[in-house]
Amino acid sequence: MKTLTVKEIKEHLQSVSDEKDPFIEQCKNDERKSVQALVDAWLKKNERLSAMREEWQAMTSFERSLRARGYQYIAGIDEAGRGPLAGPVVAAAVILKEDCEILGLTDSKKLSKQKREDYYSYIMEEAAAVGVGIADAHEIDELNIYEASKAAMLKAVQALDVAPDYLLIDAMSLAVDTEQSSIIKGDAKSASIAAGACIAKVTRDRLMDEYAEKYPLYGFEKHKGYGTKEHLNALAKYGPSPIHRRSFAPVKAHE
């Protein structure tokens, strides 16, 4: 082992994926402290990866069970933006490929903005199909937020390039003929729903950033339309913008 430099060992470890690889045992027996530090770091990283793979197995249990029953195109559906005082509610439907592995994907609210952006790019590129549906503030005021969320979800399903044969929906049911399951807190239990939640969240955040440029008085780029103190103060000072939800009490109070 000592014929290899520390740099060479570091490079070789990057190609090792199994803790039972003889090279790992050789590293453990190397007396150099720098090599011990490298192997300790590799073992910790491998442990994290193993845990993430176990989590992925749990997150895909619904999908695997459905595929075993003969379903092929399983769409996970979720929305973002039910709570804000301004902007649309955005839904996304995602059909993941059977062999995909998106380690670390979970409830989008638990992910950093950068992680969401990274997953968004990967899902958009690697998913079998992605559909997005939007219900704007006017539609929300006409229907109510619950029905508008369902309308956005229906639009997302209709926007898929591949017709799904099963729907996994976060805490909702849709009036369609396609077989479906409603899963409470589905974005923490189903990979397909988590993928849909991520696409919906990133899409909506980007829309709110665009609205921030169009209506700069409200700080939409910071709070994305949620009722923060800054947002409520701007509402009181300037009144509602064209994208505010006038059926929501805090907005109605300032018309």
From Swiss-Prot:
User: Which Pfam families does the UniProt record give?
Assistant: RNase_HII
Catalyses:
Endonucleolytic cleavage to 5'-phosphomonoester
GO CC annotation terms, alphabetical: cytoplasm; ribonuclease H2 complex
A Gene Ontology annotation in the biological process aspect, one of them, is: mismatch repair
Q: What does the record's cofactor remark say about binding?
A: Manganese or magnesium. Binds 1 divalent metal ion per monomer in the absence of substrate. May bind a second metal ion after substrate binding.
Q: Where does this protein hold a divalent metal cation?
A: D78, E79, D170
Write one Gene Ontology MF term.
RNA binding
Disulfide bond entries: none
Q: What class of enzyme is it?
A: hydrolase
Kindly state which keywords UniProt assigns to this record, in alphabetical order.
Cytoplasm, Endonuclease, Hydrolase, Manganese, Metal-binding, Nuclease
Major location category of this protein: cytoplasm
**RNase H type-2 domain segment(s):** 72-255
Outline what the protein does.
Answer: Endonuclease that specifically degrades the RNA of RNA-DNA hybrids.
Family assignment? Belongs to the RNase HII family.
Name of the protein:
Ribonuclease HII
What organism, scientifically named, is this protein from? Bacillus licheniformis (strain ATCC 14580 / DSM 13 / JCM 2505 / CCUG 7422 / NBRC 12200 / NCIMB 9375 / NCTC 10341 / NRRL NRS-1264 / Gibson 46)
Record lineage: Bacteria, Bacillati, Bacillota, Bacilli, Bacillales
